[in-house]
């Protein structure tokens, strides 16, 4: 078996080195995502012959699965090693979150071996032009501009935005707990997992090179967000929370953060909607420039 183990902070340089050979716009390729959600998905990692290999457990209780190898070297040999690892563990060999360009790479080294399927868009990432999120320009985003302008008018002199720092991280986490209580989800398993992930990210904020922001009204936090630059041209927003009872709060934290923290990228990846109808509607309403489509690869026969 391959020597899979829990991912640690010390893996960050090697993960980023392996990922640098592929400019894939999927959030699963981001070290921050792998690290902060490691307990939730039982994420395990190992390195072999210049490649990063990842094994995860799906939330539906199904068999463990693998991410497609990223790195530089003999991709075919590494795929064979993963298949052997699955066999030795008594697992069906399944590779998830396969980017479209990776399909071409796999086909080049193991032609006709795999079937690639895309059964649901629930896990596909929403990827936007950073400029559009900064300016909210154009007819399609007029409703977003209106909400931002109404917020600024209604709360003139009462609202403020600030970048996340060591001094205000605790305020962001306190708002997360408030948000969970406000939405009646504090005891749900998924949100317990999210709380653990947020703790991991905020506790290691500087080492993970995160950027974040807080929106305040009358001095109290009403929204926060954070993420990281995952590729030379893409920023990934890992978390965004706002008080839904305050109209325009979500739109404000979105725009204010991107205006201040995403000027060095072309794209902003706001991750998937998980099949949640409200989240899907919200993400589609910003009109993504593209979707990060994720395929599943299984051996034929």
Where are these regions (language model features)?
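Aromatic (often tryptophan-rich) hydrophobic motifs at membrane interfaces
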Residues: 210-300
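Short catalytic-loop micro-motif centered on adjacent basic/acidic residues
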Residues: 94, 160-162, 267-270
